[in-house]
């Protein structure tokens, strides 16, 4: 038999176990904590089944040794959930219900709010306590400083008195040895003034993260802390020993960090405030010490020892030096030096430079009469886009080259913040051309200028013919005056009178107004048979606006049916009361045909002129006059009729005439005779103009031809800019929307040429007055003289008609117009011109559609016919029903359908119409919902030609 002792490598079960058997619980009950992503957690009961194990003393349990000194680690390791081993039962964890989740969230939120409120209240209490302590320390320091100040003042006075007594009692010492006499003089030195500083709180243990400014100020004397030591890091209460989720741990850490940061910031702010107060107190004490330095009258020895109120052993603040004092001062100096930056800049105060935006520059912007958008922007030193944006915001669409008037430019400059300065170069030129006042000794009597005004066909020109013994009326087209005529008449007495004959037609309003402005007396001609007419009233208004006296000539008194008294009554209603009725208006009854009353009229005119005392300076004044009429003559060029008003106009003079200039080549009087000079109130015809001036322009003589050219060119440029601004105004958004809603208005373009400038103005104004809501006349070009090839080319490009008034077209213009099929119209009377243009406009108007009701029929019966529909059996109640008409179905006076008649029959025959009282059958196209007692209204649509009136 073998030995019963087993070998070391034998693994067979023996009766005696090598280790002792320990019976432990095979089933252990515990709980684990289940955490969810949303922050909730739940405890779950877990049972762990174990097998029997053999344990030796001191062996490890569960893979780790039990350490009694580290319960936290054991707790954490025990609480860590273990993954189930293979073969063990897996437990499924039940998730929380929505109600439980909501309740848990409310609980956590309430807890967080309670913690925040408690922390806030605690911080407020701490801040209030610190504030009270700081205030108490400040008051105590102020009281102590006041007490020490009083003691120092008393000691200083005492020292001064003792020094004065000692100086008076001691013998005078030699000046050469002041040092030997110094010890013999007992000098009382004032005790050092010790300023009590408020005892700061005990320095808290400063952590490494704190800033330099947070270190406490050094105490004046070592003293026990007056308050218990406060730690920056307060001990945090231990959390209950339970497993927290990751979100909860992060939230708690965040709150702790925020509390710590806010607490440190509060402490730092308190320390800074204390340091600021301490610095301010020290500065105040130093300033007070400098102000109160005593001036002691002592001997030379005392003066050597006492300098500026302190001993040589005192510092600048008046305090004695000591070892502790030197140490503290050195510590403070080093501390201040550390706070200063390194390098050379340590000697200077830190300076922080900041970039500052440049201040806006406001300018005085000079604005002429017209200016472009780009030029205005350059003068304001801004971008053109800014000006365009500003005008766009105001509703104006402009471009960089758009011309603005002065008022608009002023508004833009003010809106941009600049100061506008409006200048007028035209005003400067006018001031240059103005010669000033005339001396009284140079004035001489001049002939009166009399304008004859009145209604058309009342005999104005015939009256002038009777006075001049001429026959102008027979040479006028249509028997009416269409130009201003200027004549000078020499009476039998030798006196001279200048007459201006103005047109009476309504189209010549501008001519009449121009004649009233240059006249001295107005002769108002009224026909005794017609009485006061519209142009008569207009002439009265022109004369009143010009403040010119009126002499009424009642013409045609020899004509049957004349009633001068009615004329006087009508004129009285307009403010012209006759002298016979107690007024101040002169009435003269004349007859241009028989010559009756002509001499009386001349006498009244001379009397009125004498009362006006008309004078001028003919010798010592530059010539000045007004252009009455201007035209373009084929052989002589531009010709103008001028009425000289002051000075004397001579041949060879250089003149500025409106936008033109001239060197006078010839002067012709009213009868066509050449003269060498023209005196005041004399009408003459001037030859030698650079162009055709406008009627009403001023003529001024100048000394220099170059200056005359410059003025003329400047005026032409200004007129060109004004025309461009008028022709191309800034487009407004409101106007654009209005055109979009209403549609474009059709235009009739006209190129107008006339013999004289006054006729051009009159005809153009008459054409512009022809208006209609759908069409209007647009005069695109005007000129004086015959129609040439360029006028026809302009008409071709713009699709215009060419109108000539008292002029004709040359051969080239006629050939071009024939090839291009351009309509050329020629007129001598303004009536015919206006009538033809009106007819042309009416021809372009679209006809209007007018509805005409023919009759009514009542539905008596409705028949249903296959493949046709409903047929109405009707009775015509009034009018007729036509086959080609339209029907309107009325049901209780309400229109239910409109449409054409499909079929109209009487019995079985188709008929064209059915009259009143007869029955018929009517079929309506595309409508079958006809009921008994409906009324059928028959109507037709017809086109009617529109008229301008």
Swiss-Prot record:
HAMAP family in the record: IF_2_B
SUPFAM superfamilies, alphabetized: Initiation factor IF2/eIF5b, domain 3 (SSF52156), P-loop containing nucleoside triphosphate hydrolases (SSF52540), Translation proteins (SSF50447)
Binding site for GTP: 454-461, 501-505, 555-558
Coiled-coil annotated residue ranges, if any: none
Positions of region (G1): 454-461
Gene giving rise to this polypeptide: infB
Name of the protein in question: Translation initiation factor IF-2
Top-level taxon in the UniProt lineage: Bacteria
Signal peptide range: none
A single GO molecular function term of this UniProt record: GTP binding
Keyword Transmembrane assigned: no
Residue ranges with Low complexity bias: 165-183, 217-228
Role noted for this protein: One of the essential components for the initiation of protein synthesis. Protects formylmethionyl-tRNA from spontaneous hydrolysis and promotes its binding to the 30S ribosomal subunits. Also involved in the hydrolysis of GTP during the formation of the 70S ribosomal complex.
GO cellular component: cytosol
Compositionally biased residues, Basic and acidic residues: 67-92, 101-164, 235-288, 330-339
Record bears the keyword Repeat: no
Region (G4): 555-558
UniProt-annotated location(s): Cytoplasm
Region (Disordered) residue spans: 54-183, 217-288, 305-357
Family: Belongs to the TRAFAC class translation factor GTPase superfamily. Classic translation factor GTPase family. IF-2 subfamily.
InterPro entries reported in the protein's UniProt record: EF-G-like_DII, IF2_assoc_dom_bac, IF2_II, IF2_N, P-loop_NTPase, Small_GTP-bd, T_Tr_GTP-bd_dom, TF_IF2_bacterial-like
Chain positions covered by the region annotation G2: 479-483
Region (G5): 591-593
Domain tr-type G: 445-619
